[in-house]
Structures are given as structure tokens and as C-alpha cells.
């Protein structure tokens, strides 16, 4: 239901509990000639930022994420790196477009193999007939556990892992960087558009970080402008 307030007051907001429900609701707004829909997400609800749902995103971070500037910058920079993962080739996008379940490998002869993986938590992978995996497509989440399992196997040396979008990547920076250093690559079927990064230097416990230092350090780390919206008022 959509409503307009007749007077000042307090409201209790609720909304769709899934991305599918959210997309349906957004489509229903066409009849109201709505030009802009703003989705309120969180770092713990990254799926809302999927390019399948939103056209672009603003990354809001701050002292609530970490009260240490160095740690906060490192964590945020990694999130930005994931958002900016390269789009995979058009050939791969066409090849995997209609696959919605499982994990699939493409060998050096461009033949596809169903690895019979039912979950990203599984360590049982069917590698029969595969000498080297050129491309690995994951329809679900890419987790630390799965990455730990495959990166030690020669068949996955210098493999490109393709996921639907950045919200499907649940890797720690250490594992991600180790995979890339080994010649691996992670790319996406749908690329997100990051249009701004904002910070709130005030933590929930009242601790306040140096806003100027935070914005400057983070901007240098991610090579993007960073805004403290409170100072922009």
C-alpha cells in the first residue's frame, strides 16, 4: 500500500521482505508516475544493492562500522573493490544467462561441465573430465569455505570465477587477495554503479572520529570523493 500523510506525525515503516517483493512493489509505482525510488539498505543487507534491483547505489559507512579510522578505511575499501568488480565477457554473459542453479565449469575447449555442487558450503565437486577450468560460474554465493577448497586445486589455477553480482561475494580480504595474486579473477554478470560514498564519523556510543582525516584517508584509498553529509548541511 502507498499513502500520503495529511499532517505531521510519526510513522512506522515496513516493506517487502525479499528482493523479488521489492521489485514487484517498485514496478507497481509506475501508475503513480514516480521518478525516483530510494531503497534504504545496510552493510548487513547488501542484496538490496544488487543491480537486479537498483540502478545505482550510494555506499554509506562510518564509525558504526568501525571506530578505528585505519580499520574503517580498509573495510570500506574492500567493499568498494567488490562493488567495482569487472563485468565478465559478453560471451560468458550469454553462456550463463539462463543458468539459475548450481556451479558450472568451462574448460579450455569451451565445454561446460555441471560440477554437481548443491551448496557453496559443499566440498564435494565433480571434476571428472576436466583438466583445467578456464571459467567457473556460481549461481549462488561465493564463500570463504568454497574458495579455500578450490584454490588449492591445480584445475582452478588462473580461473575466472563469475558470480551474478557483487552481493553474492562473501569473501574475506585475505582470501580474495590470495586468489588474485595466484592469477585468479572474480567478475560479475551484472555490474553495479557506485555514485557516491558517504561517512558518518559518529559512533553509536558517542565516539566521534576526525571527519576531515577520515574523508581524506578514505578518498585516497578508494580514489573517489567521500562526503560527510553532516558537514554538507
PLM features per residue range, with description:
Residues 1-233:
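Flexible phosphate-sensing "switch/lid" loops adjacent to ATP/NTP-binding sites
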Amino acid at each position: 500500500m502507498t499513502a500520503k500523510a495529511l499532517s505531521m506525525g510519526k510513522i512506522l515503516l515496513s516493506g517487502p521482505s525479499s528482493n523479488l517483493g521489492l521489485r514487484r512493489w517498485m514496478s507497481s509505482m509506475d501508475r503513480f508516475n514516480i521518478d525516483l525510488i530510494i531503497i534504504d539498505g545496510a552493510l548487513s543487507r547488501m542484496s538490496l544493492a544488487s543491480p537486479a534491483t537498483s540502478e545505482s547505489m550510494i555506499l554509506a559507512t562510518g564509525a558504526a562500522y568501525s571506530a578505528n579510522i585505519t580499520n574503517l578505511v580498509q573495510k570500506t575499501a574492500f567493499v568498494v573493490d567488490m562493488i567495482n568488480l569487472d563485468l565478465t565477457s559478453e560471451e560468458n554473459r550469454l553462456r550463463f544467462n539462463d543458468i539459475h542453479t548450481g556451479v558450472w565449469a568451462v574448460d579450455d575447449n569451451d565445454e561446460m561441465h555441471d560440477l554437481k555442487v548443491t551448496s557453496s558450503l559443499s566440498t564435494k565437486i565433480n571434476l571428472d573430465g576436466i583438466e583445467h577450468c578456464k571459467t567457473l560460474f556460481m549461481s549462488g554465493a561465493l564463500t570463504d569455505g568454497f574458495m579455500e577448497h578450490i584454490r588449492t586445486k591445480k584445475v582452478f589455477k588462473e580461473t575466472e570465477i563469475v558470480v551474478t553480482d557483487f552481493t553474492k561475494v562473501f569473501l574475506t580480504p585475505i582470501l580474495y587477495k590470495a586468489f588474485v595474486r595466484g592469477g585468479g579473477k572474480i567478475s560479475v554478470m551484472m555490474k553495479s554503479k557506485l555514485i557516491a560514498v558517504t561517512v558518518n564519523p559518529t559512533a553509536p556510543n558517542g565516539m566521534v572520529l576526525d571527519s576531515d582525516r577520515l574523508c581524506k584517508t578514505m578518498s585516497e584509498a578508494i580514489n573517489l570523493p567521500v562526503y560527510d553529509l553532516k558537514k554538507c548541511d
